[in-house]
Design a protein with these regions (language model features):
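Short helix-coil transition sites and intra-membrane helix breaks within transmembrane domains
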Residues: 11-21, 171-178, 211-224, 253-262
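Small-residue-rich segments of transmembrane alpha-helices in multi-pass membrane proteins
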Residues: 10, 80-86, 135, 158-172, ...
Length: 308
């Protein structure tokens, strides 16, 4: 169950559509730093880090921290595979609605992956949010769609929260509050503006990574920290992308506590592990994630032109 928790959260970090908070972070980078990050930019940069982290977590978790006894390795349900096969067969073949759903999902993913080519092909760009909206509209169209309007459950409260959070983050930049906070911090701690880039990079990644132990909302972490990081980079004369994008890569690493994300809560209710187990495993893998992002920053991200 803990390995499922790692997989769900860490693998979602490999894609910018893994969470709304990722998109908000990219919107800050574009509006405050003027740098556009495309779907494939994020995927090519962070997916190798994520896959490496997953492999290491598989070695550390089941192989070292939570070794299974021979008895535990045996199937918990007698004939479990046969039961699953029967349930799968009972579902029958793909229905017309399921095929439509797969096609609509494929269209949305295609729009996401090809976002950098839209302007050249169509004269305008379909960003990740618009692609999702288009998919939703298609799903609700008569005959073509798979849902009726009265069946759609739109979480307006989440949309309003995300919009308000984004507006709040932009206000930090537009009012100069983020820059003022950075300058005040420099004066208060007598900060050396000539600090080594990699020292600063490591501190920022660590703060972003470990902050999920304090802030349970990914969106809240994003609107508090990403504008501050961009303002910090500007104040030091560093390309904001070099600090803000790697920091954004940590947003979905909410693996330390059962309350850190909805999937964590669902998995915890199965009663297969304790809060301490989750905390211990999450802290270890989070620390490994910081190390991996540091190594990637010095090698892979540098090759991609993200870090100097």
């Amino acid at each position: 169950f803990l390995q499922n928790l790692m997989g769900i959260n860490i693998l979602s970090a490999g894609f910018m559509t893994g969470s709304t908070a990722n998109l908000i972070a990219l919107a800050f980078i574009f509006s405050m730093a003027g740098t556009k990050v495309y779907y494939t930019d994020w995927m090519f940069a962070n997916l190798p880090v994520v896959l490496t982290a997953m492999f290491i977590s598989w070695l550390i978790g089941p192989k070292l921290l939570f070794r299974l006894t021979n008895k535990e390795k045996q199937p918990a349900i007698k004939g479990g595979i046969d039961v699953l096969k029967k349930q799968l067969d009972a579902m029958g073949k793909f229905s017309a609605l399921e095929k439509k759903g797969a096609v609509i999902f494929g269209i949305v993913v295609l729009m996401w992956v090809t976002d950098r080519f839209h302007f050249g092909l169509f004269g305008f760009e379909i960003n990740a949010v618009m692609a999702a909206i288009i998919g939703g509209v298609i799903a609700l169209l008569p005959r073509v769609g798979i849902l009726k309007w009265n069946e759609a459950d739109i979480p307006w409260h989440l949309m309003l929260f995300s919009a308000g959070a984004y507006a709040g983050g932009l206000a930090l930049n537009d009012t100069g509050a983020a820059t003022w906070a950075v300058q005040s911090l420099f004066k208060a701690i007598n900060f050396d503006k000539h600090i080594n880039f990699w020292v600063l990079y490591t501190v920022i990644i660590a703060v972003m990574m470990y902050s999920h132990f304090v802030f349970t909302s990914k969106t809240m972490r994003t609107i508090i920290l990403i504008p501050f990081i961009i303002a910090l980079a500007k104040e030091l004369g560093i390309n904001p992308l070099a600090l803000a994008l790697p920091a954004a890569f940590t947003i979905d690493w909410v693996i330390g506590l059962p309350i850190s994300a909805k999937p964590n809560v669902i998995l915890f209710t199965a009663g297969q592990y304790s809060v301490l187990d989750n905390l211990k495993y999450g802290f270890i893998i989070s620390t490994i994630g910081i190390i991996l992002l540091l190594i990637a920053g010095m090698t892979w991200f540098k090759f991609l032109g993200i870090t100097p």
